């Protein structure tokens, strides 16, 4: 029942034509490409898109399939959460834990529509936690094979969640194996290095842009602290879902850490190792000193490690004040969704603007071997409606578009840098095509890029909201 409530809450947020956030059409384009060409339109880790394509095959509608995946895939977390919580023989713990995770403000008001890959891989991390909790109950062969298999699932699904999994398992292993022999440690380090090298090699092949970002992060780790999240917290005129998540992550990890210390004798060794690992991960991932380019994603994922720790702690401690503190933290988390539910979720366009955008697309067909330039969010809708390659507006001046016969620009009238030119006639109607270019892929947008640039050309078609400008 708790899982059904979570699914219903997610579906209620995606009832409009456009998904919340800026990147919903990215998933539409990727799924269409999988169904049409058995490949992705933009380079990315493929598993979630293939699952969405399978759903689309069943329901016969790509946007509906993406909407279903947005609601159902995160709800799979209910299975491992139930299996973890039932170990502690607390009657209402499984249901409450499932509700807190599925109705968490980050789950509803940050992941929905925009970060489907992030939320879709969260259940796998809960399954990894289940394996670690049962480490001393199951055979080591079964546990290791399970961890390897689950890691591979994450590795072909989402890079950020892979970092979370490595952090959780790595910290757990450090606590578990701290009294092991030097030979055992050296063997473990060798295995970890080999696994990391293999995963980086796979990332370099599947998503070169993410591999380059990871290498840049390793070589210049100070970059992660540029434009720290606390600047946004201090200067923002209103509270945001991620500000709430940062406060919850920081304070909860400290409070739960104190409870764990006072009641450490009540935990099994495996449980204690996992709790310590989860609290360290939560505190680091939700830190406000992390730069905004990374902060939102890491803070969003920290709800997983925090939830795992809270379940184990509530199930293990016996003192009333300690249980009460965990209960209060869970209640605050759920109640924090109420003020956020009154706010309108950000979308690429209003309903009227989206109607005008589709009207524009219906009157113009873009020739083969063309690319459309548009602002973030609009580029994915352009790829969806015009079935062509796209490039992000803020990258246009540095992007190599020399291989394209034509370059077009989506001008939002009254919003972005104006185009120029007369009202040219519509082009002839050639066959449409879409390439597998990396341009326009779902990359992270650095916060210091200009919001708009001037792109000029000949207006091919316009309506009350948009103009299609031919740049060359």
Task: Mark where each language-model region is.
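Short periplasmic/luminal acceptor-recognition loop of GT-C membrane glycosyltransferases, typified by
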Residues: 336, 346-355, 362-426, 435-438, ...
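Membrane-embedded helix bundles of polyisoprenyl
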Residues: 2-7, 28, 48, 52-57, ...
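Extracytoplasmic catalytic/substrate-binding loops of multi-pass membrane glycan-assembly enzymes
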Residues: 15-30, 40-54, 61, 348-356
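Transmembrane alpha-helical segments
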Residues: 104, 313, 325-349, 372-374
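Membrane-interface helix caps and helix-loop-helix hairpins in membrane proteins
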Residues: 15-16, 107-117, 289-296, 345
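Membrane-interface helix-loop-helix junctions at transmembrane boundaries of multi-pass membrane enzymes
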Residues: 86, 139-140, 177-190, 253-281, ...
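Hydrophobic/aromatic-rich transmembrane helices and adjacent perimembrane loops
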Residues: 118, 163-164, 290-319
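Transmembrane catalytic cores of multi-pass membrane glycosyltransferases
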Residues: 6-14, 23, 44-45, 116-117, ...
């Amino acid at each position: 029942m708790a899982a059904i409530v979570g699914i219903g809450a997610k579906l209620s947020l995606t009832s409009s034509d456009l998904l919340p956030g800026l990147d919903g059409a990215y998933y539409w384009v990727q799924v269409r490409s999988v169904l049409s060409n058995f490949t992705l339109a933009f380079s990315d880790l493929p598993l979630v898109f293939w699952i969405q394509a399978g759903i689309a095959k069943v329901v016969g509608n790509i946007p509906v399939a993406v909407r279903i995946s947005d609601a159902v895939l995160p709800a799979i977390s209910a299975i491992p959460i139930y299996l973890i919580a039932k170990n502690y023989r607390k009657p209402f713990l499984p249901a409450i834990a499932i509700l807190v995770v599925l109705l968490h403000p980050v789950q509803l008001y940050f992941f929905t529509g925009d970060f489907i890959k992030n939320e879709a891989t969260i259940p796998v991390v809960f399954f990894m936690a289940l394996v670690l909790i049962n480490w001393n109950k199951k055979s080591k062969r079964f546990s290791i094979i399970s961890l390897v298999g689950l890691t591979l699932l994450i590795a072909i699904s989402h890079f950020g969640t892979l970092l979370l999994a490595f952090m959780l398992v790595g910290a757990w292993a450090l606590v578990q194996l701290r009294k092991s022999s030097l030979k055992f440690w050296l063997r473990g380090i060798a295995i970890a290095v080999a696994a990391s090298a293999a995963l980086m090699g796979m990332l370099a092949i599947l998503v070169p842009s993410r591999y380059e970002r990871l290498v840049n992060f390793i070589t210049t780790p100070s970059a992660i602290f540029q434009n720290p999240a606390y600047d946004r917290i201090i200067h923002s005129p209103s509270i945001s879902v991620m500000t709430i998540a940062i406060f919850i992550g920081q304070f909860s990890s400290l409070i739960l850490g104190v409870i764990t210390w006072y009641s450490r004798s009540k935990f099994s060794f495996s449980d204690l190792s996992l709790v310590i690992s989860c609290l360290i991960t939560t505190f680091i991932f939700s830190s406000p000193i992390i730069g905004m380019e990374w902060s939102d994603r890491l803070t969003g994922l920290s709800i997983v490690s925090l939830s795992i720790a809270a379940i184990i702690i509530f199930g293990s401690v016996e003192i009333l004040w300690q249980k009460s503190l965990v209960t209060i933290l869970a209640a605050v988390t759920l109640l924090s969704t109420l003020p956020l539910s009154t706010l309108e979720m950000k979308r690429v366009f209003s309903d009227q603007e989206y109607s005008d955008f589709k009207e524009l697309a219906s009157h113009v067909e873009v020739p083969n071997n063309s690319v459309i330039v548009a602002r973030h969010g609009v580029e994915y809708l352009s790829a969806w409606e015009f079935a062509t390659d796209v490039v992000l507006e803020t990258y246009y001046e540095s992007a190599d578009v020399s291989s394209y016969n034509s370059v077009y620009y989506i001008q939002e009238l009254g919003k972005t840098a104006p185009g120029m030119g007369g009202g040219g006639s519509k082009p002839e109607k050639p066959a449409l095509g879409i390439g597998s270019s990396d341009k326009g892929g779902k990359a992270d947008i650095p916060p210091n890029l200009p919001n708009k640039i001037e792109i000029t050309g000949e207006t091919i078609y316009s309506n009350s909201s948009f103009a299609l400008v031919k740049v060359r």
